[in-house]
Every structure is written in C-alpha cells, then in structure tokens.
C-alpha cells in the first residue's frame, strides 16, 4: 500500500512542478510583445503627424486673443522705430 502511494506521489510531483513553472511564466511582468508595441507606436505617430499636417493646411488654428494681422516686414519696422525713438530722446542729467 505504501509502495503504491509513493509511486502515485512520484507521478504527481512532475505535474506539480510543471504547473508551478507555467504560473511563473504567466506572472512574469517583464515579458513584452515588442512587435505589437512597435506597430502601435508607429500607427500612433502617423495619426499625430497627419493631424498636425491637416491643422497646418486648414489654417483653422488661431490665437486665443484678438490680434490684427501684420505685414511681413512689420516686425522689422517696429524695431527700427524703437531704435530711432531712443536715439532722438534728450539725455536727462542725473544729480
């Protein structure tokens, strides 16, 4: 009787060890599917790139505050006006 019990237990031992190894594989948090992650990242990048190009081409993205449109050389003219305005002001004497 004891011999049969030992024999049955010896048959069950590899099954228990195999199931423990499978559980360890399933619970491994550092096993990643890099191919799926890579494809998902590329799809996400293409979608964001396409949305950005569409926004640029549609010109619907406007500033939140009201600003009158400027001429292309307007920024340079403002800088020149500031320089000439500072040059023409009389120097104040400090006491």
From Swiss-Prot:
Regulatory subunit of the sodium/potassium-transporting ATPase which is composed of a catalytic alpha subunit, a non-catalytic beta subunit and an additional regulatory subunit. The regulatory subunit, a member of the FXYD protein family, modulates the enzymatic activity in a tissue- and isoform-specific way by changing affinities of the Na+/K+-ATPase toward Na(+), K(+) or ATP. Keywords: Cell membrane, Ion transport, Membrane, Potassium, Potassium transport, Signal, Sodium, Sodium transport, Sodium/potassium transport, Transmembrane, Transmembrane helix, Transport. Pfam families: ATP1G1_PLM_MAT8 (PF02038). One of its GO terms (biological process) is potassium ion transport. Associates with and regulates the activity of the sodium/potassium-transporting ATPase (NKA) which catalyzes the hydrolysis of ATP coupled with the exchange of Na(+) and K(+) ions across the plasma membrane. Reduces the apparent affinity for intracellular Na(+) with no change in the apparent affinity for extracellular K(+). In addition to modulating NKA kinetics, may also function as a regulator of NKA localization to the plasma membrane. Belongs to the FXYD family. Residues 69-95 are annotated as: Disordered. The keyword Ion transport applies. It comes from Homo sapiens (Human). It is found in: Cell membrane. It is a single-pass type I membrane protein. Residues 58-95 are cytoplasmic. The chain crosses the membrane at residues 36-57. Residues 19-35 are extracellular. The keyword Nucleotide-binding does not apply. One of its GO terms (molecular function) is sodium channel regulator activity. One of its GO terms (cellular component) is postsynaptic membrane. Its main location: membrane. Residues 1-18 form the signal peptide. This is FXYD domain-containing ion transport regulator 6.
